[in-house]
C-alpha cells in the first residue's frame, strides 16, 4: 500500500515553510511514506508562486525521494464563495478567471517540478447541478486540450460544494470516462448523514470507477463529532474503514493519504496502522 500525508504548510514566512517541509520529508522517510501533499491556498497564490515555492523550498522538493501531490485552492468555508469563481461557474467570465489561475499553477510546476497529481475542485454550488456539470465539462475539456496527459483529479467536496452530493459526484464520473478522482471518506460519510447502509451503497457505486481512483483522503466522522476527525479515534457510528478498503481501496496504485494530523509522526503511524490493520481483516 502507498501512503502519504498533508503536513499543512502555510505561507506565514518562507523560513517556516522550508522548516516544515524539511520536517515533513524527515517524517515521511521515518514512516516509509511515498507521497506528500501540499495545499496551494489563495494566499500562497496571491503572494506569487515563485515567491512562495522558489529557492530552497523547490530545491527540497526536487531532491526528495517522495512524490508530491498539489491540492489547488481547497474550499475553505462557505463564506469564501464570493472569492472562489470555480471552474464549474455557469458564467463564462468568472470561470475563465479560475481556468487562468489553474493554468498558471500547472505551467509553473510542470516547468520546475512536475506533480504526481494536481487535485482540483469544482467550486461552490450557485445553480442547478446540471448547469454546473456542463460548465465543468467545458473546463475539463479545455484543460485536457492545453495539458494532455497532465495528471488532474477532482474530489468530492464539503457541504455547499458542487460535488458534495454523492449522486452528483457519480454523475460526473459517469459523464467523464477519462477523469481521475480523489475520494474524501469523511466528507462522503457526512454527505449520507452517517448512514452506514447509504455509505456502503456509495462505495459499491464508486467501485465501478476504481481504476480511476488516484487517492483516498482518509478522515473519520460521526454524528456530533464533525466530518474531519482522525481515523485512529474511536467514534460511535464512525467510519467503516474495512468496508471502504474492501470495496474501493485494494488497488496498489491508490495513495492512502492522511490530512487530519498534520506532520505529527506518532499520529501518522496510528493513522496508517488503522488502515493497514483494516486491510488485513
Language model regions located:
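Histidine-acidic metal/acid-base catalytic patches
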Residues: 1-2, 29, 99-114, 134-141, ...
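N-terminal pre-domain/capping segments
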Residues: 1-103, 281
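Acidic-and-aromatic substrate-binding clefts and catalytic sites of carbohydrate-active enzymes
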Residues: 10-20, 39-55, 76-80, 125-133, ...
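An acidic, carboxylate-rich microenvironment
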Residues: 20-23, 168, 243
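Active-site acidic/histidine proton-transfer and metal-coordination neighborhood
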Residues: 62-63, 78-180
Amino acid at each position: 500500500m502507498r501512503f502519504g500525508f498533508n503536513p499543512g504548510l502555510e505561507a506565514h514566512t518562507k523560513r517556516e515553510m522550508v522548516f516544515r517541509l524539511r520536517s515533513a520529508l524527515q517524517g515521511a522517510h521515518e514512516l516509509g511514506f511515498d507521497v506528500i501533499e501540499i495545499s496551494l491556498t489563495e494566499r500562497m497564490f496571491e503572494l506569487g508562486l515563485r515567491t512562495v515555492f522558489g529557492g530552497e523550498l523547490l530545491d527540497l522538493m526536487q531532491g526528495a525521494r517522495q512524490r508530491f501531490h498539489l491540492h489547488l485552492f481547497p474550499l475553505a468555508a462557505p463564506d469564501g464563495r464570493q472569492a472562489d469563481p470555480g471552474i464549474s461557474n455557469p458564467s463564462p467570465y468568472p470561470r475563465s478567471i479560475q481556468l487562468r489561475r489553474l493554468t498558471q499553477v500547472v505551467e509553473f510546476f510542470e516547468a520546475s517540478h512536475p506533480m504526481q497529481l494536481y487535485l482540483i475542485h469544482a467550486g461552490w454550488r450557485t445553480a442547478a447541478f446540471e448547469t454546473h456539470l456542463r460548465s465543468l465539462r467545458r473546463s475539463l475539456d479545455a484543460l485536457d486540450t492545453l495539458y494532455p496527459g497532465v495528471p488532474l483529479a477532482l474530489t468530492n467536496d464539503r457541504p455547499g460544494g458542487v460535488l458534495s452530493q454523492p449522486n452528483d459526484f457519480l454523475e460526473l464520473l459517469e459523464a467523464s470516462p477519462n477523469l481521475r478522482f480523489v475520494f474524501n471518506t469523511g466528507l462522503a460519510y457526512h454527505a449520507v448523514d452517517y448512514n452506514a447502509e447509504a455509505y456502503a451503497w456509495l462505495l459499491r457505486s464508486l467501485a465501478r470507477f476504481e481504476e480511476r481512483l488516484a487517492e483516498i483522503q482518509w478522515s473519520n466522522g460521526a454524528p456530533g463529532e464533525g466530518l474531519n476527525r482522525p481515523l485512529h479515534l474511536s467514534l460511535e457510528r464512525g467510519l467503516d474503514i474495512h468496508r471502504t478498503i474492501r470495496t474501493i481501496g485494494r488497488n496498489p496504485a491508490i495513495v492512502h493519504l492522511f490530512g487530519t494530523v498534520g506532520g505529527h509522526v506518532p499520529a501518522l503511524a496510528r493513522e496508517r496502522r488503522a488502515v493497514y490493520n483494516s486491510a488485513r481483516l
